[in-house]
Swiss-Prot record:
The gene is TRF5. Keywords: ATP-binding, Cell cycle, Cell division, Magnesium, Manganese, Metal-binding, Mitosis, Nucleotide-binding, Nucleotidyltransferase, Nucleus, Phosphoprotein, Transferase. The modification Phosphoserine is found at S596, S602. It is found in: Nucleus, Nucleolus. This is Poly(A) RNA polymerase protein 1. Its cofactor is Mg(2+); Mn(2+). It is an enzyme of class 2 (transferase). GO terms for molecular function: ATP binding; metal ion binding; poly(A) RNA polymerase activity.
Length: 642
């Protein structure tokens, strides 16, 4: 125990540590000393040939090449002498005088003379000059290639300005307007894209008809209005004669049918929402498809939007710009609080419809798209009162209304929200799902600042500094595949628009919820619009019958025969008048009590049998007061008759 304590005492440990350190230093020093002794060893540098004598004649002998054909002494031996240069002789003499190896001057020269170096330098200069002095055609070709590369590098982020340079525009607003038109032409659908979408819709429609013969598939949304971006989805709706396809079982049945037919991949069925929907991708065209059920408001909205496009120039251009702006910032999805397509269209339409300079015909819309785009961002990014103001569009006219006056407005998540009345249903707020309005307003305000600052910057720049610049590129980003500037909508018919117009020609406006006209059958228009007259109600038929009886009783009786005495005639007329008065009184009582005519007739027959034949019937009008017992007996008899 004592040794252990001494071993682990601080002093012992310190002494042991110092001893170990000294040993390491000594060993390292010894190893280093042995390595340095190599340089002090003269034996490794001993010159073994120092004692040998150098013969001067060896140079001449060594320089001669002797060829011996045979050993005969009488044969002359030819000798070929190699002439050495003066520099070689001088080098040999210097080597004889000095031992370069001993003097540590045994370096190897890379060239024999400076003439070779000068010749090499001249050759390099000739090659460099020959490379620089190329043909003028090749120089211009290289310059043009470099300029094309520079232009392509500048147009990577702004492909719509390729071969469309507007930097020489004197007015910056005209530059922005031209750039907006170029962008719209750049993203407009080509002939192949329209054909691809038409084929996809035809395949889906045949599949729905194959599953349900009484149903049909219709297209609404951006594809039915020509307001879709490249690669945007297609909105469809399935309507049937019985209007029962919104049931969950039918939805899953259609989903299985499309998947078995190979028309859908990455399918998602959403049934626990207000509007059930099927989302999938068509594998051949890679287009996103959304299918809803038993809805007609989208088809009505598509027709209304096409009317707006015909009446409002510049609406399509601004809508496509705003859609791309929101798409690049991921603010176009309603499920995440963004703005939907119909909401954007209503915003732009109300903006153009209420712009003071447009209403006064002060400016042309198509020539001032740049200014209008900046005004749009300023209005909805800085000046619009989202807390108190709503937008109303009725009969093609837009207006602002206070939210307090919209009594049927559903309460939103926050007071700061966008409210737009549905043009087809004034009680519906089409923008109630856009709950992320704060970020959308910030995006609009930021776009306004970017456009204004860029316009000021390029307005003060020279034409040389404007080359390759873009104003719209500060707020619009397009990262899709390269496209051509071909707007080929006039070359191919859009079947979605044709089917929508045909649908509205066949369809009548639905008045009752339980009335649905099957517009899928190819019937004449006259038969579709022909409605059966509804059957008359029973009460109305009874009332008409009673009125006819009263009119008959009011008609005077035919003239009597001359053989009848006057007294009998008076008596007969008196009875007729009394019977008509009694009948009128009974009608009023029956109408008040709700008794039928059969009960009345049976009651009268019973009274007729009880009354003696010789007595005259007394009219109820002669009784001025009716006591309680009489009323009790009357109602008791009515109850027994029933």
């Amino acid at each position: 125990m004592t040794r252990l304590k001494a071993k682990y005492s601080p002093t012992k440990g310190k002494r042991k540590e110092d001893k170990h350190t000294k040993r390491m230093r000594k060993s390292s020093f010894t190893r280093t000393q042995k390595m340095l002794e190599v340089f002090n060893d003269n034996r490794s540098h001993f010159n073994k040939y120092e004692s040998l004598a150098i013969d001067v004649e060896d140079d001449d002998t060594f320089g001669n090449l002797v060829l011996m054909e045979n050993d005969k002494s009488d044969v002359d031996i030819p000798v070929i002498e190699e002439v050495t240069s003066s520099e070689d002789e001088q080098r040999a003499e210097s080597s004889k005088r000095n031992n370069s190896l001993e003097d540590n001057q045994d370096f190897i020269a890379f060239s024999d003379s400076s003439e070779d170096e000068t010749e090499q330098i001249k050759e390099d200069d000739d090659e460099r000059s020959s490379f620089l002095l190329t043909d003028e055609h090749e120089v211009s070709k290289l310059t043009s290639q470099q300029s094309l590369n520079t232009e392509s590098a500048c147009n990577v982020e702004y492909p719509w300005i390729r071969n469309h340079c507007h930097s020489k525009q004197r007015r910056i607003a005209d530059w922005l307007t031209s750039e907006i038109k170029d962008f719209v032409h750049y993203i407009s659908p080509s002939k192949n894209e329209i054909k691809c979408r038409n084929r996809t819709i035809d395949k889906l429609r045949r599949a729905v008809k194959e599953l349900w013969s009484d149903a049909d598939l219709h297209v609404f949304g951006s594809f039915a209005t020509d307001l879709y971006l490249p690669g945007s989805d297609i909105d469809c709706v399935v309507n049937s004669r019985n209007r029962d396809k919104e049931d969950r079982n039918y939805i899953y049945e259609l989903a299985r049918h499309l998947k078995n037919k190979g028309l859908a991949i990455r399918m998602e069925v959403i049934v626990k929402t207000r509007v059930p929907i099927i989302k999938f991708i068509e594998p051949q065209s890679q287009l996103h498809i959304d299918v809803s059920f038993e809805r007609t408001n989208g088809l009505e909205a598509a027709k209304l939007i096409r009317e707006w496009l015909r009446d409002s120039p510049g609406l399509r251009e601004l809508v496509l710009i705003i859609k791309q702006f929101l798409h690049s910032r991921r603010l176009n999805n309603v499920h995440t609080g963004g703005l939907g397509g119909f909401t954007v269209i209503c915003l732009v339409y109300s903006f153009l419809n209420m712009h003071p300079r447009i209403k006064s015909n002060d400016i042309d819309v198509l020539d001032n798209l740049g200014v209008l785009l900046i005004d749009f961002f300023e209005l909805y990014g800085k000046n619009f009162g989202y807390d108190d103001v709503a937008i109303s569009i009725s009969d093609g006219y837009a207006s602002y209304i206070p939210k307090s006056c919209w009594r049927t407005l559903e309460p939103s998540r926050s007071k700061f929200s966008l409210a737009i009345q549905d043009p087809g249903d004034p009680n519906n707020n089409i923008s109630r799902g856009s709950f992320n309005m704060k970020d959308i307003k910030k995006a609009f305000a930021g776009a306004f600042e970017l456009l204004v600052n860029k316009c000021w910057e390029l307005n003060s720049a020279t034409f040389k500094d404007r080359v390759g610049k873009s104003i719209l590129g500060n707020v619009i980003k397009y990262r899709g595949q390269k496209r051509d500037f071909n707007d080929e909508r006039d070359l191919v018919q859009n079947k979605a628009i044709i089917e929508n117009e045909r649908y509205h020609k066949r369809r009548t406006r639905i008045v009752q919820e339980d009335l649905f006209i099957n517009d899928t059958e190819d019937l004449p228009v006259e038969e579709i619009y022909k409605l059966d007259e509804p059957a008359k109600k029973k009460q109305k038929a009874k009332k008409d019958k009673r009125e006819g009886e009263i009119k008959k009783s009011a008609i005077p009786s035919p003239p009597p025969d001359f053989g009848v005495s006057r007294s009998k005639l008076k008596r007969k007329v008196k009875k007729t008048d009394q019977g008509s008065l009694l009948h009128q009184n009974n009608l009023s009582i029956d109408d008040l009590m709700g008794l039928s005519e059969n009960d009345q007739e049976s009651d009268q027959d019973q009274k007729g049998r009880d009354t003696p034949s010789g007595q005259d019937e007394k009219s109820p009008l002669e009784t001025k007061t009716v006591d309680a017992q009489t009323r009790r007996d009357y109602w008791l008899s009515k109850g027994q008759a029933l």
